[in-house]
Amino acid sequence: YGHSAFAKPDGARFMARQAAEASHIVATQHQLWTGGGAVLIQQAQAAIDAGAFHNDVVAVSNGNVLMFHAQSFDQKEAAVEALKRACGAKDFEPILLEASSDELNLDEAVRSYLFNSQIVSLPTGGMALILPREAEETPRAKAFVDRVLATNGPIREAHYLDLRLSMRDGGGPAGLRWRVVLTDSELAAINGRSILDGARVAALEQVVNRRYRDRLGMADLADPALLDESRTALDEISQVLGLGAVHDFQRV
């Protein structure tokens, strides 16, 4: 979290997007406090001011591995110790891969989207980093990745991909995925039509092509018809995904 919803740090360039209270209630609703299953760690204001509005721009994890920038957390030493205690309560030790400010400054970390990458577990064992091309083209970000690979730790491969279409739309690599680990029974309980497949992609594309305007100008934003068109599109998307009446206007 960034800070309390009821406080604004003095001299802050940007407001935090995650409030302590919101993060706390998420952990409560998911019953994560039992047995020390949750740790609330505050983002460093320096990272937020550098453009890391979401912490996945300066830290990324997979399994027991956390890769992070030295300036990602407020009171880093205390945050790391709290994390170690929580992991110890779950009978495992975290592997911490830290980029110091000397080897990679915050501007380089944010610009390269190094920590916005994905760490995946390989079927053959070990892990791989999937990164945007920007990380490869930023010399010190690339040097950090090379150092991680050379340590003979769990991350054994690095793959750089062209994700500039996503970057131009204002999102980094993390905007292309959201991973939720589920058991077989949990997966079976999900509305099957919410799982993306070829048929679902085609149906969603048809809604977009049929309902979305191909450009928006100031006059469009003042056009009452845009509201009706947007609601029609949302209603059709809800039908494609089998969501039912999830929006207020659908229940009128």
List each model region and its residues.
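The feature marks the mature, well-folded catalytic cores of soluble enzymes
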Residues: 1-252
